[in-house]
């Protein structure tokens, strides 16, 4: 339970530590063959680090690790916070609240079959210290008015003055599939309608990985530093379980 303090602190969309909202205009699609420039509602999730980028690859890993911990030791987790992350029990284990927070965001990052998104924002975020509710970085949509949302195109995307080494979609698709499949089992007793929704999406996400094997790396605009994931087989194996 102690580690969940950190997860609540990292929440995006609404942050219970600040008792304020942030990044509520996210975001605008990039790299999609027909939807680039359109708005997509991808509020929620967690900030990746001390910056405010958000990645499917790291968020899905965090979600799955929490789900696995709860699945193996459900009696180890208490209920001292509500779903918004405020003090006060709500009848749901706090770790399940946090799992649900993450899965809600992951669901937004997969709005339709074959439409998977890998990342919100990029290293243009690295523009000085500020709290998330004071983030006014301008990505071309106006200061603080929305950030880019990177579509899993399966093709190389920007990496500073270079391109990343993306070869497919499977590494990300497998993560969606595994999180949705296990998440549906864990949430069915608490959020049955949402559990059914993500359960239906699990196979579609997996099939997208089958169609587009390969690794889906993250993107950067100003520097060459990214998550250089090059393995995708393990993600698809977990998604198939």
Give residue spans per PLM region.
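Active-site lining segments of carbohydrate-active enzymes
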Residues: 39-49, 117-230, 237-241
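Acidic, glycine-anchored loop motifs typical of Ca2+
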Residues: 84-95
């Amino acid at each position: 339970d102690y580690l969940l303090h950190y997860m609540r602190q990292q929440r995006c969309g609404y942050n219970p530590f600040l008792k304020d909202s942030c990044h509520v205009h996210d975001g605008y699609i990039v790299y999609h063959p027909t939807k680039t420039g359109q708005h997509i509602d991808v509020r929620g999730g967690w900030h990746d680090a001390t910056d405010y980028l958000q990645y499917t690859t790291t968020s899905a890993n965090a979600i799955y690790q929490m789900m696995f911990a709860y699945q193996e030791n459900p009696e180890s987790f208490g209920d001292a916070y509500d779903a918004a992350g405020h003090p006060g029990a709500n009848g749901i284990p706090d770790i399940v609240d946090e799992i649900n927070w993450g899965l809600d965001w992951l669901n937004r990052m997969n709005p339709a079959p074959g439409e998977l998104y890998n990342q919100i924002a990029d290293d243009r975020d690295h523009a000085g210290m500020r709290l998330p509710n004071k983030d006014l970085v301008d990505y071309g949509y106006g200061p603080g008015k929305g950030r880019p949302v990177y579509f899993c195109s399966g093709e190389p995307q920007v990496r500073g003055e270079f391109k990343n080494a993306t070869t497919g979609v499977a590494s990300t698709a497998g993560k969606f599939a595994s999180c949705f499949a296990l998440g549906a089992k864990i949430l069915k007793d608490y959020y049955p309608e949402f559990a059914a929704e993500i359960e239906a999406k699990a196979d579609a996400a997996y099939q997208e990985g089958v169609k587009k094997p390969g690794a889906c790396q993250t993107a950067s605009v100003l520097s060459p530093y990214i998550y250089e994931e090059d393995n995708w087989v393990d993600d698809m194996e977990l998604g198939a379980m």
